[in-house]
């Protein structure tokens, strides 16, 4: 028992890369978590921060506001520019819009399922 909350909190305009693992951590608004990253228990990523792909944030580590971190374990790389912090929410919105465009490509039965349903309806077949 660590005394840390067992929940993971992700706030608005956050981009989490594919295959990332988030364990009882907090990600404040407008952050980017690179793909294949791991955030351990009690870690905190503050507003306007970026964690590079493949990074590992140890338990209890805090990534301060406006910083870029990378590596295993994650270490400070540099401070983000004002322009970079302005682009973070724009990226989140763009990815969300793109996901809506491709939503039907990831059905559990593939898109063939939709074609079969249309054909069954056209032929009057009920199952």
Spans of features found by a protein language model:
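Short, flexible active-site loops
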Residues: 14, 22
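Glycine/small-residue-rich loop that forms an oxyanion/phosphate-binding "nest" at active or ligand-binding sites
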Residues: 5-13
């Amino acid at each position: 028992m660590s005394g840390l909350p067992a929940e993971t909190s992700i706030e608005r305009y956050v981009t989490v890369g594919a295959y990332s693992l988030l364990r009882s951590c907090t990600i404040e608004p407008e952050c980017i978590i690179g793909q294949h990253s791991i955030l351990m228990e009690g870690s905190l990523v503050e507003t306007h921060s970026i964690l590079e792909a493949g990074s590992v944030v140890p338990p209890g580590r805090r990534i301060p506001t406006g910083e870029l971190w990378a590596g295993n374990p994650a270490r400070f790389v540099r401070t983000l520019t004002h322009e970079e912090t302005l682009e973070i929410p724009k990226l989140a919105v763009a990815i969300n819009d793109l996901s809506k465009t491709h939503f039907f490509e990831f059905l559990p039965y593939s898109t063939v399922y939709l074609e079969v349903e249309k054909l069954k309806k056209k032929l009057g077949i009920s199952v």
